[in-house]
Amino acid sequence: MQILLVEDDNTLFQELKKELEQWDFNVAGIEDFGKVMDTFESFNPEIVILDVQLPKYDGFYWCRKMREVSNVPILFLSSRDNPMDQVMSMELGADDYMQKPFYTNVLIAKLQAIYRRVYEFTAEEKRTLTWQDAVVDLSKDSIQKGDQTIFLSKTEMIILEILITKKNQIVSRDTIITALWDDEAFVSDNTLTVNVNRLRKKLSEISMDSAIETKVGKGYMAHE
């Protein structure tokens, strides 16, 4: 597994690198924190571990840059005790978030879970679902409607897949949260709401924002 570890604390970087390499992860770091994208593009990581507080530009800035060109899974690290950091990370399309200090074995478990969730279907045939007059490509995280195509983050696609496989049925928020994250403590009602809102915003680009209905106090429903 190729891991890009964007961490400016060299002591922590070396500790994590040593631990991750014991699990056969290939870990790369950053030499110039003004050129994170250069390393990102040359190393081609399968997962990015991204610190929030970095020199020159913060982790949120680099997350935006990465999302412009890739849906690679991103796990944020932060020493700040600020719930809005979690919300911001979800708004930007991150897959998980951990607050420092943390147990390394928990980080490794999260990385393994993310890898399984994101890459377990890469060797399988193309997987598609039909929803209204659109085709949802689960292998490419895309939705095609006519000549229009939109691309979703992995998290958004997981939410959508859960909903459209249970069309016209209410899916509880707890069900979605359980499917998304192994560590449910990471997810609040607000972070799930943020993800659904981001999904709806993308669906609006193909005039399908009303296809997912909020059932207040119950969950969400995708209409046939």
UniProtKB/Swiss-Prot annotation:
Record bears the keyword Hydrolase: no
Superkingdom classification of source: Bacteria
Null mutant phenotype: Decreases the resistance to vancomycin about 2-fold.
Domain Response regulatory residue range list: 2-115
Bridged cysteine pairs (disulfide): none
InterPro entries linked to this entry: CheY-like_superfamily, OmpR/PhoB-type_DNA-bd, Sig_transdc_resp-reg_C-effctor, Sig_transdc_resp-reg_receiver, WalR-like, WH-like_DNA-bd_sf
DNA-binding region: 126-224
A GO MF term: transcription cis-regulatory region binding
4-aspartylphosphate carried by residues: 51
Keywords: Activator, Antibiotic resistance, Cytoplasm, DNA-binding, Phosphoprotein, Repressor, Transcription, Transcription regulation, Two-component regulatory system, Virulence
Pfam families assigned: Response_reg, Trans_reg_C
Cell compartment(s), UniProt: Cytoplasm
Keyword Cytoplasm applies: yes
Modified residues (Phosphothreonine): 128, 130, 149
GO biological process terms on file: regulation of DNA-templated transcription; response to antibiotic
GO CC aspect terms: cytosol; protein-DNA complex
Assembly mode: Interacts with GraX.
Function: Member of the two-component regulatory system GraR/GraS involved in resistance against cationic antimicrobial peptides (CAMPs). Upon phosphorylation by GraS, functions as a transcription regulator by direct binding to promoter regions of target genes such as adhesins, exoproteins, transporters, toxins, and proteins involved in cell wall synthesis. Down-regulates the expression of many genes involved in RNA and amino acid synthesis or glycolysis.
Name the record gives this protein: Response regulator protein GraR
Organism of provenance: Staphylococcus aureus (strain NCTC 8325 / PS 47)
Source lineage: Bacteria, Bacillati, Bacillota, Bacilli, Bacillales
